[in-house]
Amino acid sequence: MVGASPLLRMERVNKWFGDLHVLKDVGLSVDAGEVVVVLGPSGSGKSTLCRTINRLEPIDSGTILLDSRPLPSEGRELARLRSDVGMVFQQFNLFAHKSVLENVTLGPVRVRGLSRRDAETRARELLARVGVEDQASKLPAQLSGGQQQRVAIARALAMEPKLILFDEPTSALDPEMVQEVLDVMTGLAREGMTMLVVTHEMGFARSAANRVVFMDHGQILEQAPPEDFFASPTTGRAKDFLSKVIRH
């Protein structure tokens, strides 16, 4: 809708770790249904940016708005925020002592108030959607890394979030397992899920992103549609980065 506010807006966001200034006056907006991929070298602030959006990392100054409302700092409102903003981590972060099905149903039952029966029905649908429906009774350790990450995506989807954050979701996977996770993410993008994805997967950025954001040293240096960013980056730093990560 023309004139609608972005789902996510970050304005002049700063974050320090001691003397290290990791986010420097960051401004970013994400519209509902948009897929934004954040690229940049290691240590550029990409993961910290991701983690500030659901307050896993509090910011030192600036504003972050979700649905035009500032992020709450604590209590029930923070729990509500985290149910609206899903997150998929590099290391999966599944509950090791709970089955795959329990991992996916826990949040909807405890936070959303679903009945266990409804939550399990929904969980099985989501596990089928990501291709691991036959793993429902297993513990995470019995699954491959790619399967665990697909369960983590199903767990995020089970909360029916407005936005899902992906923090380098394939970087801990063996190379042959990367594509199965990217295929699930590409499917979500095509279905209209709002996604902010920190990744080194250039193919995903090219094919699935509406916009590429390039970061270095805690700053957003450029933003562009992927076809423009990969064909003609405007900053020397982005050109240098692409020359190193893309093999011709």
Residue ranges and their predicted role:
Residues Q223, E227-H248:
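C-terminal boundary and immediately downstream tail of ABC-type ATPase nucleotide-binding domains
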Residues S5-P226:
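ABC family nucleotide-binding domain
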